[in-house]
Amino acid sequence: MKSKLKLHGFNNLTKTLSFNIYDICYAETPQDQQAYVEYINSVYDAERLTRILTDVVDIIGANILNIARQDYDPQGASVTILISEQPVTPTESQIEESPGPLPETILAHLDKSHITVHTYPEIHPVDGIATFRVDIDVSTCGVISPLKALNYLIHKFESDIVTVDYRVRGFTRDVEGKKHFIDHEINSIQNYLSEDTRNGYQMTDVNVYQENLFHTKMLLKQFELDNYLFGDATSNLSPEQREQVTAKVKHEMLEIFYGRNVAV
């Protein structure tokens, strides 16, 4: 077993895991499209996103400093959680009998370690293809690894397409003064995914090892059209229409996966 690296002082490495998670569906009528946006806004509102991120904090073994969250009109939500590696000791101002901070001041002492999430519901103006995007950033400073949150987040959002970026920045020193620009072995983000996740997705890596930069794209392998239909489309489509919608949805997924417009 490899021995732990002895450090001089605090571990100053910053590890950041960034997700772009996409969920695709087809909503045939304008009424269904509006209903889809309202559904997403209710299912993934700021309160539920806070619960999900709180679970992430527990998974990576961190401690919550502060939470700020917001639902947006007409659509979308965001949550920011500041975290620390060590348990937080209450300050005198926190335990004395005095008014607490105003909402506007809650993020005044921004910490290096944080988790953020933003949601972006979107609908094609003509084709009825609806895309729900979730952007998540987990940034930690010290020995805490954000990679522990991978499987949980991918499954929690029932992801069709996922792009994941992981980078390590800064350096820390050992007791002899030697710099270390990464404190763990990693060849691919895929190594941190469970077997069922790896089997369920088509995956592509683009890694720049010398820069401690790792990138993985994921596309769900199994396609069942009924899982992508919303509203009237779940029962009103003819076999020919189902075939057309299947082509539209798959085309949308491929464009997002490859990150460019693809000719039909």
UniProtKB/Swiss-Prot annotation:
InterPro entries: AdoMetDC_fam_prok, S-AdoMet_deCO2ase_bac, S-AdoMet_deCO2ase_core. Heterooctamer of four alpha and four beta chains arranged as a tetramer of alpha/beta heterodimers. Its cofactor is pyruvate. It comes from the Bacteria. It holds the Pfam family AdoMet_dc. The keyword Ribonucleoprotein does not apply. Belongs to the prokaryotic AdoMetDC family. Type 2 subfamily. Catalyzes the decarboxylation of S-adenosylmethionine to S-adenosylmethioninamine (dcAdoMet), the propylamine donor required for the synthesis of the polyamines spermine and spermidine from the diamine putrescine. Binds 1 pyruvoyl group covalently per subunit. One of its GO terms (molecular function) is adenosylmethionine decarboxylase activity. Is synthesized initially as an inactive proenzyme. Formation of the active enzyme involves a self-maturation process in which the active site pyruvoyl group is generated from an internal serine residue via an autocatalytic post-translational modification. Two non-identical subunits are generated from the proenzyme in this reaction, and the pyruvate is formed at the N-terminus of the alpha chain, which is derived from the carboxyl end of the proenzyme. The record marks K112, S113 as: Cleavage (non-hydrolytic). Keywords: Autocatalytic cleavage, Decarboxylase, Lyase, Polyamine biosynthesis, Pyruvate, S-adenosyl-L-methionine, Schiff base, Spermidine biosynthesis, Zymogen. This is S-adenosylmethionine decarboxylase proenzyme. GO terms for biological process: spermidine biosynthetic process.
